[in-house]
Amino acid sequence: MTIPRIRQPRAVIDRKALTVVLEDLAATVTDNRERRARLLAVLKGALGDGRAEVRRRFLEEKGTGAAVFAENSHLMDQIIRLLFDFTTTHVYPRANRTIGEQMTVLAVGGYGRGEMSPQSDVDLLFLLPYKATPLHEQVVEYMLYTLWDMGLKVGHATRSIEECIRQARGDLTIRTAMLETRYLWGDRALYGQLKTKFWTGVVTGTGPDFVEAKLAERDERHLRMGDSRYVLEPNIKDGKGGLRDLHTLLWIARYIYGVSDMRELVELGVLSADAATKFGRARAFLWTVRCHLHYLADRPEERLTFDVQPAIAARMGYTDRNSGRGVERFMKHYFLMAKTVGDLTRIFCAVLEDQQKRRPILSIATLLMRKRNLGDFVLDGGRLAVAGRGAFREHPLQLISLFKVAHDHGLDIHPDTLRLVTEHLPTVTLLRNDAKANALFMEILTSRKDPELALRQLSESGVLARFIPDFGRVTAQMQFDMYHVYTTDEHTIRAIGLLHRLETGALRDRMPAAADAVHKVQSRRALYLAVLLHDIAKGRGGDHSILGAEVAMRLGPRLGMSEEETETVAWLVRHHLDMSRTAFKRDLDDIKTILDFTGLVQSVERLHLLLALTTVDILAVGPAVWNNWKSSLLRELYTHSKDVLTSGFQAEARDKRVAHKREELAAALADWPQASRERYLDLHYPAYWLTFDSATHLRHARMLRRARDAGLTVAVEVLPDPERAVSEVLVATDDHPGLFSKIAGAMALAGVNILDAKITTMSDGGALDIFTVQTLEGHAIEKEERIARLAKTVRDVLTGDLPLEKALRRQPPRLPERTRHLTVPPRVIVDNQASKTHTVIEINGRDRPGFLYAVTRALTDVAVQISSARVSTYGERVVDSFYVKDVFGMKIVHRAKLAQIREALEAAITQTVPRKVEEGAEQGAEKADAGEIVAA
């Protein structure tokens, strides 16, 4: 292997001049310790100067990663050569070396490939003809200690030729390393002997074994790294679609074909010229990104974490545009390159598998398969293939039917056929208005056999983006936040697979309501198409739900949907966020919430469809997003809405319902003295009786009596509810302004998240506040010591024994430091239409310790009473919804008061002086109704 020639190499390091310096040093300094110190200073200075020049060229002259790799490799080569010559000539000189004392220094690994990034290790192999002699040991030790003292990380091995061959036969890692050795200095003939023996004694006849082992190694690495190239913070080296996948291609190509560059495979007919060009572009892009990453982190960092993504995007020229943020455009380019690597890896490795892996004995299943009707296709080695190279040109429909037949029969597609698909992608555009092609696609999408794999194959091959260009626009599209784990296309395909699992009952334990609802759906085709299209318009600079509905209206007829089906799909896409917004942000005990939602849905069929779509949409966001609490909220909204849609709203008189609830509790408290019972019933206002069920009323009554009997001024009880993965915290004390905010602050100190809160006041001036909480990890609080600690923290804060403000300032950040670049525009929405009795205030901001305390204290400071709250967290973004009244118990309607509230809340969200921001950001879903104030 050789490295490319670099521009003005002596500006990086001048070995000739340094040789003169070292010769003079050896001649004038006789003390060994002093001489070594001076040698170290010279080499360390040369290394530092060289690295600075390489960095300057890269950053100031907009250089490439390829140039950095070549320049760093050249720099290190000269350092090694200078050190070797000085060591063997002046430190351990030997006039007449025997054959057994010869030595060669080889570069190995990334250094051997000439891919030396700014923070790469230096991997060396000291090659000997026979067993190591004392001279060898002295030279190697002197060189290694000098390199270590220079601050280099050196991986090293000292082996004879026979040791190299023996170990390469038995160890795949060593065998792979031997593939990319590069001569540095010493006896060149020795290296020639090693190469000859390696290729004849190790490689010959072992190609199939090597291919199998490297592909298995690749698969294991993918599983270890998450098995997806579409993750928020990808590993550029070891992640799927990263540099290690390209290395795998190179290793196999070199092992099987003896090539050192992928372009040589074009001449051999293994790779197309276009594929070789794509390989080069992907590698060059990843090299450049990796160099920026190493320079920014100043360490061998391989993950594109949130904190470096914006900086790298800016350095590589990705600026913000109307169509999206620069960092999102950069990451989209990264994911597209990772996809390209995946495409190349799949096709090339499949070709090699087909050529090199031992062919399996034909099973009975395969023999029977040959008798099945595969249409226009044939089996080649057990894989589905076209009948001839002109098949797609003569019959373009086969570009779709290929995937349908493979899906129906559970067959892999032959690599040569996949390569032909890639070559004929422009032909797919001719199929967009072909009725048969659209019908075939809908059969794949709605297949009773899991359609996820077929859709993924259509996407990976590039066919899906050509067939539905709107899908191509969201391919590799990411959102720069912690909530959306996958790119839009990956999220969508996962959602389709989850919908299939929901239908089969595989998810029934986690989401029973949705599993029941999906089987009651009449418009199954509409549901699957709605899932495919629900995020189709993301990244277009407007409300993606509205824009997506327009796409659905256009695509539906093309895909063979009836007018009714098309309207259903468009409605689902338009409203695919409304069910989760209502369930997670609104008070489900407020009948107007239910009536407004059912007024939107209008039919049980649409309710079933929307629940199924909402469920798989949330599940497909990421593995940690769904939880039992969200499941219970959606189930509650679904159940209440279904009751209204099937039976109608029973507008029983308010007084009658209150009286009925009081009578039920009175009966349950039969063991209480009558006077005590009546006194307790009179404590609560009508709203309390209508908010909770009878079992909850009884639990509250017994808790308040225990507190009174114990003479407690502050009573706290924690009730775990593992089934919903939450705990209920009851707090009883005297009512006073700021009570809610103090409890919220105490919860933050105790390390729990508030999900829901109900604030009730009593006629004797007492307060009973009910909080639904989780641990920061999303679990119920069940351990006794954790329960006791939470209760004590709340009590100590309310009694004044624990100074709240001071304690909150000591709280560590909620989010990792690397996420500091993830900003959330402060947003305050005041809605006077959502409830008949309350003003609803929704707040969006960046999560931090004490966030809920800060905003509730701000509400207290402007004389706003909180009746209930709902808290949701989406990665770094927190959304709090409050049902509030003014000091007179009325909705807040005056513009001046609303403006005061907005300014106070905005200051609390940002922890800065309130500032006016432009309204109408697309991130905020709802628009202001009449009388609401929005701070975007």
From Swiss-Prot:
<dbReference type="Pfam" id="PF08335">
    <property type="entry name" value="GlnD_UR_UTase"/>
</dbReference>
<feature type="region of interest" description="Uridylyltransferase">
    <location>
        <begin position="1"/>
        <end position="372"/>
    </location>
</feature>
<keyword id="KW-0511">Multifunctional enzyme</keyword>
<feature type="region of interest" description="Disordered">
    <location>
        <begin position="915"/>
        <end position="936"/>
    </location>
</feature>
<dbReference type="InterPro" id="IPR003607">
    <property type="entry name" value="HD/PDEase_dom"/>
</dbReference>
<dbReference type="GO" id="GO:0009399">
    <property type="term" value="P:nitrogen fixation"/>
</dbReference>
<dbReference type="InterPro" id="IPR013546">
    <property type="entry name" value="PII_UdlTrfase/GS_AdlTrfase"/>
</dbReference>
<keyword id="KW-0808">Transferase</keyword>
<feature type="domain" description="HD">
    <location>
        <begin position="488"/>
        <end position="610"/>
    </location>
</feature>
<protein>
    <recommendedName>
        <fullName>Bifunctional uridylyltransferase/uridylyl-removing enzyme</fullName>
        <ecNumber>2.7.7.59</ecNumber>
        <ecNumber>3.1.4.-</ecNumber>
    </recommendedName>
</protein>
<dbReference type="Pfam" id="PF01909">
    <property type="entry name" value="NTP_transf_2"/>
</dbReference>
<feature type="domain" description="ACT 1">
    <location>
        <begin position="728"/>
        <end position="809"/>
    </location>
</feature>
<feature type="compositionally biased region" description="Basic and acidic residues">
    <location>
        <begin position="915"/>
        <end position="930"/>
    </location>
</feature>
<feature type="region of interest" description="Uridylyl-removing">
    <location>
        <begin position="373"/>
        <end position="727"/>
    </location>
</feature>
<dbReference type="GO" id="GO:0090293">
    <property type="term" value="P:nitrogen catabolite regulation of transcription"/>
</dbReference>
<dbReference type="InterPro" id="IPR006674">
    <property type="entry name" value="HD_domain"/>
</dbReference>
<feature type="domain" description="ACT 2">
    <location>
        <begin position="840"/>
        <end position="915"/>
    </location>
</feature>
<keyword id="KW-0535">Nitrogen fixation</keyword>
<keyword id="KW-0460">Magnesium</keyword>
<dbReference type="GO" id="GO:0045893">
    <property type="term" value="P:positive regulation of DNA-templated transcription"/>
</dbReference>
<dbReference type="InterPro" id="IPR043519">
    <property type="entry name" value="NT_sf"/>
</dbReference>
<keyword id="KW-0548">Nucleotidyltransferase</keyword>
<dbReference type="InterPro" id="IPR002934">
    <property type="entry name" value="Polymerase_NTP_transf_dom"/>
</dbReference>
<comment type="similarity">
    <text>Belongs to the GlnD family.</text>
</comment>
<keyword id="KW-0378">Hydrolase</keyword>
<dbReference type="Pfam" id="PF01966">
    <property type="entry name" value="HD"/>
</dbReference>
<comment type="function">
    <text>Modifies, by uridylylation and deuridylylation, the PII regulatory proteins (GlnB and homologs), in response to the nitrogen status of the cell that GlnD senses through the glutamine level. Under low glutamine levels, catalyzes the conversion of the PII proteins and UTP to PII-UMP and PPi, while under higher glutamine levels, GlnD hydrolyzes PII-UMP to PII and UMP (deuridylylation). Thus, controls uridylylation state and activity of the PII proteins, and plays an important role in the regulation of nitrogen fixation and metabolism.</text>
</comment>
<keyword id="KW-0677">Repeat</keyword>
<dbReference type="GO" id="GO:0008773">
    <property type="term" value="F:[protein-PII] uridylyltransferase activity"/>
</dbReference>
<dbReference type="GO" id="GO:0018177">
    <property type="term" value="P:protein uridylylation"/>
</dbReference>
<dbReference type="InterPro" id="IPR045865">
    <property type="entry name" value="ACT-like_dom_sf"/>
</dbReference>
<dbReference type="InterPro" id="IPR002912">
    <property type="entry name" value="ACT_dom"/>
</dbReference>
<dbReference type="InterPro" id="IPR010043">
    <property type="entry name" value="UTase/UR"/>
</dbReference>
<dbReference type="GO" id="GO:0008081">
    <property type="term" value="F:phosphoric diester hydrolase activity"/>
</dbReference>
<dbReference type="Pfam" id="PF24931">
    <property type="entry name" value="ACT_ACR9_3rd"/>
</dbReference>
